């Protein structure tokens, strides 16, 4: 199936469901408590992440779509933390505050990558009047192309049928990530996205592919669904619609590091693609590709349009191309396990020219893998002025990633990549121009880790500034 990315910016999606805050306390354990036979964790890092339905909304927003989120919270620090974290990624929150209940919070204590304990702070929202949620849905319907109901059985979706009916009257597709075995609650939905175990909890264990398809088709008919998407982990996904042959999408994950939140990514990308105008089949294809990306990351994660573009082109499967920092760290670790020498350079690369290509080819010859760190648009403006860059970040990275000499491309927001270099610690740091090695950002960190720093010459007479001036003078 040949699928192109839609313009997610014109997609509006409302997510309604059980929102929660995931808290993580990290620290070393050096002794056993004298009070009880338990380890003492000296907490040195605290992290907070939106979870549940909030993670679905984050996945939608990460694509550039307009994500709205409705859910139930308390009036407490956890609710404020959720709103703060979500506003940072442009999710529009419209929570219903319930003063008698705490915001659902899950606190995990970890040491040396091991979870020692999880503490859940929740009472559930059973019995809470759903009318304010209905009102928020009604107000949002004219502005959205899809409604997602994210059910974690915490009470926000206890009255799900009126929500489905509101959307159907407005001709807005309803996508549901179900919970439990009572699918009668979801009658009339456009699409359900159960995983295999959730599906088999309703229809019984399926011995083979034929049995899965037959029982799935029966479920679609019984509950008046438009479609059913069964996510099947390493076996991919299967889309079932009455009157159409089943569509099986094999997994695109090359390596699996963490499946946390993969279901949220699937329904988030699927809804955003539908709202942007893609067909259901095309949207499922994109959701499957996105799932293949996020399971290669650690922890609950989202996928960017660039990552999704790479995935559907097949580059993500090879472990190369445009990446975020987390993906890059994993790729570099794997390269080092293979005994490969990692070279890193950086720049704006606004209008790629022969000098750039020659420089990058020479840098690549110095090792086995080449990382190119690229200034963001905001960083470029600060360094070069308001009229730069000529080409936006995404286009600059895609062009660089297409070069044979370049293995990995990663963006950075700061004026220099010093922090990024300190995190990656390449074996060789390279910079072009008339710098002295000690003047190069990140050189001290690389030297301290036992690495090398080298300056390469640029091709004389070729520069982005000269090209821009030639165009202005009418010689381009």
From Swiss-Prot:
Its EC number is 2.7.1.167, 2.7.7.70. Disulfide bonds: none annotated. It holds the Pfam family PfkB. It is an enzyme of class 2 (transferase). Catalyzes the ADP transfer from ATP to D-glycero-beta-D-manno-heptose 1-phosphate, yielding ADP-D-glycero-beta-D-manno-heptose. PANTHER family: BIFUNCTIONAL PROTEIN HLDE (PTHR46969:SF1). This is Bifunctional protein HldE. It comes from Yersinia pestis. The gene is hldE.
